[in-house]
Amino acid sequence: MKTIYLHHPITTDEWTDINKVMALGFFDGVHLGHQAVIKQAKQIAGQKGLQTAVLTFDPHPSVVLSNIRKQVKYLTPLEDKAEKMAKLGVDIMYVVRFTTQFSELSPQAFVDNYLVALHVEHVVAGFDYSYGKKGEGKMTDLAKYADGRFEVTIVDKQTAASDKISSTNIRRAITEGELEEANQLLGYPYTTKGTVIHGDKRGRTIGFPTANIRVNEDYLIPKLGVYAVKFRVNGETHLGMASIGYNITFKDDQALSIEVYILDFHREIYGEEAEIKWYQFFRPELKFNGVEGLIAQLEKDEQDTRAFFAKLED
């Protein structure tokens, strides 16, 4: 897959004479709803003998449009989004730098300067996709703005267990620790990536050595607590239990940490890139009166983790 970065206003150098089918969306999470849009675009592209493209933005529009300075947390930072698009068979991913100037485009100007200029023959997007200044352009109006220059397919609302499949619902589920719900809407286990760093090394003194992970700051982090996870490092996947918290049993002013006790694992992996797939929330972070209580709880957490994955893989 080719990734092309566009800056408004795009120049003729950035245009392309390759006709294509284009899926529109921000696509954070590349969840089942997004996948339905992209699969529809791919199907049409296959029928027409065209390439499949997506048009997305960076950063999230709310970063630019908000009156207060804010940092948006993503389900899939741009690199992850590109990786998932490639796996879905997308040929080209256009990434438009979202700026104040770009946000001022009228719906007609967006259509003319981006969709038509990029030689789009057919546009596919979800029913609630909007475009142009303040999102004034709706999918029901797109054929009017196209004026016969391209075709339009609108993908209906996608649901799972009666929930609308949306990035908003997935973010809510993750921040509430509802990983099973989030993963059902995503169509895959929620995943964060980071680097293994040195920690306080307390875990090894109580029989539970952990890998401390410095997670990319762009990721949305689940709520505090202990989780069943799968941990991937050096091309191998292992079962584990992850703790997100402040180590309050030992000290009250600790920084937030993400630590993973990797089951049946005994290697040094400092400095390695790692991936955490989040499966199940077990319990909130607890403060224990002594180390003995903590060890007893960790032993139970390990039993729960093994039981969870044994049941999952039955």
Curated annotation (Swiss-Prot):
SMART domains: Flavokinase. InterPro entries: Cyt_trans-like, FAD_synthase, Riboflavin_kinase, Riboflavin_kinase_bac, Riboflavin_kinase_bac/euk, Riboflavin_kinase_dom_sf, Rossmann-like_a/b/a_fold. Pathway: Cofactor biosynthesis; FAD biosynthesis; FAD from FMN: step 1/1; Cofactor biosynthesis; FMN biosynthesis; FMN from riboflavin (ATP route): step 1/1. GO terms for molecular function: ATP binding; FMN adenylyltransferase activity; riboflavin kinase activity. Its EC number is 2.7.1.26, 2.7.7.2. It comes from the Bacteria. Keywords: ATP-binding, FAD, Flavoprotein, FMN, Kinase, Multifunctional enzyme, Nucleotide-binding, Nucleotidyltransferase, Transferase. It catalyses: riboflavin + ATP = FMN + ADP + H(+); FMN + ATP + H(+) = FAD + diphosphate. GO terms for biological process: FAD biosynthetic process; FMN biosynthetic process; riboflavin biosynthetic process; riboflavin metabolic process. PANTHER family: RIBOFLAVIN KINASE, RIBOFLAVIN KINASE/FMN ADENYLYLTRANSFERASE. NCBIfam families: cyt_tran_rel, PRK05627.1-3, PRK05627.1-5, ribF. Catalyzes the phosphorylation of riboflavin to FMN followed by the adenylation of FMN to FAD. Can also catalyze the phosphorylation of the toxic riboflavin analogs 8-demethyl-8-aminoriboflavin (AF) to 8-demethyl-8-aminoriboflavin mononucleotide (AFMN) and roseoflavin (RoF) to roseoflavin mononucleotide (RoFMN), and the adenylation of AFMN to 8-demethyl-8-aminoriboflavin adenine dinucleotide (AFAD). Belongs to the RibF family. This is Bifunctional riboflavin kinase/FMN adenylyltransferase. It comes from Listeria monocytogenes serovar 1/2a (strain ATCC BAA-679 / EGD-e). The gene is ribCF.
